[in-house]
Regions:
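C-terminal regulatory or interaction extensions
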Residues: 224-232, 242-401
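Short amphipathic alpha-helical segments and their helix-coil junctions
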Residues: 70-82, 131-136, 203-209, 271-280, ...
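N-terminal membrane/targeting module of cytochrome P450s
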Residues: 1-74, 369, 381, 386-401
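Active-site core of Fic-domain adenylyltransferases
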Residues: 80, 87, 91-234, 242, ...
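Glycine-rich, N-terminal phosphate-binding loop and its surrounding beta-alpha-beta segment
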Residues: 54-104
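Phosphate/pyrophosphate-binding active-site loops
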Residues: 2-50, 185-309
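Charged, amphipathic alpha-helical oligomerization/scaffolding segments
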Residues: 66-69, 73, 127, 204, ...
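Generic alpha-helical structural element
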Residues: 63, 83, 87, 121, ...
């Protein structure tokens, strides 16, 4: 018989208490100290408590292997890209990830919004952009206290959620009043009922996050579930939880896998929500096996999108490089054209001439002369005069399309 969740077995008239004991007594089962009260019709049942556990079924082991195999593909292709293409690729993937994590919660943000925040302009999204930028720079948060969770939250949302008085945290560190999650008019989840409970459960979570004998991918999935179960804030819990998940993946797998999480979740919003709801159901008794399996499948979908994008753009860049080599251009002109081509292929944001000067170590005056020659041959076109911005021209664009 295929491995099924306890709720399904209950409706098939199995003795789920007996089946639960079999699963808990299995020597391969990971039993955590993380405790939940199951949720029925959006309300927690304080009278029932279960320790979260999971069983590493064969499909989970297969999915883990696939994630590490995909990560090797990602890093192999990425390492073949020139420096500028790498930078622009990470920046573009990060921007898309922020847009998607916002959109999952119904928060609309555009590439222009995120790009402006990235370029030091203070906006409502500056906090979340700066935090994701830290992931790309390898400055990965390690959390050791509930105070650090609150600080990260403030850093992300002080110019956004916390501007609204309704979202102000009225406890010592977190919310002190109940919060409910609704799907339309139906209540589907309630966070922990008091700040005391929130702090106690977050301390348990931090302890779990920092233990060494749990596989990092499994730990990331369990942490994500339990953080969202607690729901310590009035708003922003989903985005905060996915940010923590991205940190885990960036640290333990690779940066681009970490930055494709929300993209994949956005494509699987119904599945994502269902994973949470089913795990919290009373008849599933705190089993995380299917939540972990589902989240690993979502991670793989994000990786596959990254691999497809990298393969396509890497081939296009190789073709462009060979084309540029065949042109009768000076070394400087070829370098300028290749840099602009990298930016065109890997980024939707224009490259300012001032930035271009830094990449090729030329003065603005000398750059202007080379740009003039390239423009005369239709290899380069002017995008903006203030600030001065150029991109590849139609002649090269037609070659790449």
């Amino acid at each position: 018989m295929a491995y099924q969740n306890l709720k399904t077995l209950y409706y098939k008239k199995y003795n789920i208490e007996e089946e639960l004991n079999k699963r808990l007594e299995n020597p391969c089962t990971l039993k955590t100290e993380l405790v939940i009260s199951p949720v029925i019709k959006g309300e927690k049942l304080p009278s029932e408590k279960y320790n979260l556990f999971y069983l590493p079924i064969n499909n989970i082991l297969f999915l883990e292997e696939q994630i590490f195999s995909n990560s090797k593909k990602v890093t192999d292709i990425f390492s073949q890209l020139p420096y500028i293409a790498q930078n622009k690729c990470i920046e573009e993937v990060m921007i898309n990830e922020i847009i998607k994590t916002n959109k999952i919660e119904g928060v609309i943000s555009t590439k222009k919004d995120i790009s402006e925040s990235l370029n030091t302009k203070k906006t409502r999204f500056s906090g979340i952009v700066n935090k994701y930028k830290e992931i790309t720079e390898g400055n990965l948060e390690k959390i050791n206290s509930v105070e650090e969770i609150r600080k990260i939250y403030d850093d992300i949302f002080k110019e956004d959620i916390l501007k609204n008085p309704e979202n102000e945290l009225d406890g010592k560190l977190f919310r002190k009043n109940p919060v409910y999650i609704q799907d339309g008019i139906k209540k589907i989840h309630s966070g922990s009922l008091s700040e005391e409970a929130i702090i106690s459960q977050l301390n348990d979570l931090i302890k779990f996050m920092n233990i060494k004998n749990v596989n990092s991918l499994i730990k990331a999935c369990i942490t994500h579930y339990y953080f969202e179960y607690i729901h310590p804030f009035y708003d922003g819990n989903g985005r905060f939880g996915r940010f923590l998940f991205s940190i885990y993946l960036a640290r333990k797998i690779d940066i681009l896998t970490g930055l494709s999480l929300s993209y994949a979740i956005f494509l699987n919003k119904e599945k994502y929500l269902k994973l949470f709801l089913e795990t919290s159901e009373s008849k599933n008794c705190g089993e995380l096996t299917f939540f972990i399996e589902g989240m690993l499948e979502i991670i793989i979908q994000g990786q596959e999108s990254i691999i497809g994008m990298l393969e396509k753009k890497h081939l296009k860049l190789e073709y462009a490089l060979n084309y540029i080599k065949e042109l009768e251009l000076s070394v400087e002109e070829s370098d300028i054209l290749f840099i602009l081509t990298q930016n065109y292929i890997f980024s939707n944001s224009p490259l300012k001439d001032s930035e271009l000067c830094k990449y090729i170590n030329l003065s603005p005056y000398k750059l202007k002369g080379y740009i003039k020659k390239l423009s005369e041959e239709s290899y380069v076109e002017t995008i903006s005069r203030r600030p001065l911005i150029h991109s590849i021209g139609d002649k090269l664009k037609n070659v790449l399309e």
